[in-house]
């Protein structure tokens, strides 16, 4: 199992970037790895997810590495814009983020792109919760949060639920907890892929 296109490069500013692309229709699913992760993922979870989404919906899937906390702004934006231009500009965007990839998606990606739907898995809630709330009220998209019951942020999920019942766009958020799952969904790759696959609902 491989990507149609896979590339790794080092930018002039020293940022290492890597991505894998599967070509499909005008629906683009962007998958952002957790901190330090490559575009394939442990047990090939991002690649497997990308192939499943493509085989099921015919969509284009772009998997992005995550070698820096600001890698989306510094490298990914240009890659995504180039892909959109190559596809003629009329596309529908979806986003899946894992851990820090979720944080970069919510805090940064929503400033650059309009997503129809986002799935954010085990996004850390311990730091800068006020920034998360601000981003949620700003982001005009449907968001599904997924947390493993063993994730360090699970004790903060009630605060997220409370905010989602009171504030603007937060009311559109869906929050799911997964029994038996830790931060990495260790031994539960199939469940991880299943949860993320809900990014498209047709």
Identify the residue ranges that each predicted region occupies.
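N-terminal cap/lid segment of alpha/beta-hydrolase-fold proteins
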Residues: 1-24
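Short beta-strand/loop motif that positions the catalytic acidic residue
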Residues: 139, 145-147
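Active-site nucleophile loop of the alpha/beta-hydrolase fold
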Residues: 119-128, 148-150
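C-terminal catalytic histidine-bearing segment of alpha/beta-hydrolase fold enzymes
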Residues: 73-74, 169-202
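Short, surface-exposed "cap/lid" segments of acyl-processing enzymes
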Residues: 13-14, 22-66
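Alpha/beta-hydrolase active-site loop
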Residues: 45, 70-88
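Gly/Ala-rich beta-loop-alpha elbow adjacent to hydrolase catalytic centers
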Residues: 96-105
